[in-house]
């Protein structure tokens, strides 16, 4: 078996990636989220495949086909809720994975980090298009509002929006193409994940100290396979509790009303995992400015290697920047809350303050904190 593991062309690749992979001996549970994201992606592809067998991407039958899945298909309700809540679990793991990367300075592995940002955009695009498919009120109006933002692009904006819609409004053509893209994107994401792992294995994993760990590496299997398995069990338990006991807690009641272009819901908002970006978008009165801020809220992650001023890689031994980091986390939670609130006083001013704070902490305060810590170290 060992000879086959090390000699067989295909198994050899798996061996170097998941079995004999030299891994730092001190990586904590924060490094579990990569494997959990792999599990989430697998769950989403499998449940999505079974949903696609029964779903029809036509405006007249989309809503009723989802109802049919829940009522008439064997365990259709379970497949549908696993897929819907699986997206939420996916984003929870994604945000924690990115947060770990920021905290421990993993952005210094530039190729892996940039690949991760591309993956984040791809997953966000997939989730957005998936939310449109049930063709409820929030599906329709969410699609209308978000795609309409592209009309802010000077000169070509309106033409671009109509090209994406396939007409003069969100209609049959839009739903069909969104279904096609929603189906193909997870497979593109899977390919990108392999590239992400390829880049990661070029440099090896980071660790909580941020120091070079070449002198103290252990094989991935069995040490981290068993550790990942524990993480998987915890995730699956949380996932099944969410799916079986609180399936609708993260959804919007408006989406149980069929899409009606003549009736606008009082509060149009995306799924919870987009609310922070939606709050940043709404905090700027100008349409183009809002769109740019929305894009920049994710693209700013690509600039983190340039904004790194500290002599140390991680925040483990940097209390000032640690404080800034946790203020940033709190700020993102505030933005998520504001994104779900109506556009009125005091939510407008809170959203604007939180949006300014978000960019200021990343671009100004964290780099300054790094320089202050460098000076403190020099004094010692």
Curated annotation (Swiss-Prot):
One of its GO terms (molecular function) is ubiquinol-cytochrome-c reductase activity. Keywords: Electron transport, Heme, Iron, Membrane, Metal-binding, Mitochondrion, Mitochondrion inner membrane, Respiratory chain, Transmembrane, Transmembrane helix, Transport, Ubiquinone. Heme b b562 binds at residues 83, 182. A ubiquinone binds at residue 201. Heme b b566 binds at residues 97, 196. Binds 2 heme b groups non-covalently. GO terms for biological process: mitochondrial electron transport, ubiquinol to cytochrome c. The chain crosses the membrane at residues 33-53, 77-98, 113-133, 178-198, 226-246, 288-308, 320-340, 347-367. Its cofactor is heme b. Its main location: mitochondrion. Pfam families: Cytochrom_B_C, Cytochrome_B. PANTHER family: CYTOCHROME B. Component of the ubiquinol-cytochrome c reductase complex (complex III or cytochrome b-c1 complex) that is part of the mitochondrial respiratory chain. The b-c1 complex mediates electron transfer from ubiquinol to cytochrome c. Contributes to the generation of a proton gradient across the mitochondrial membrane that is then used for ATP synthesis. Belongs to the cytochrome b family. This is Cytochrome b. The lineage of its organism: Eukaryota, Metazoa, Chordata, Craniata, Vertebrata.
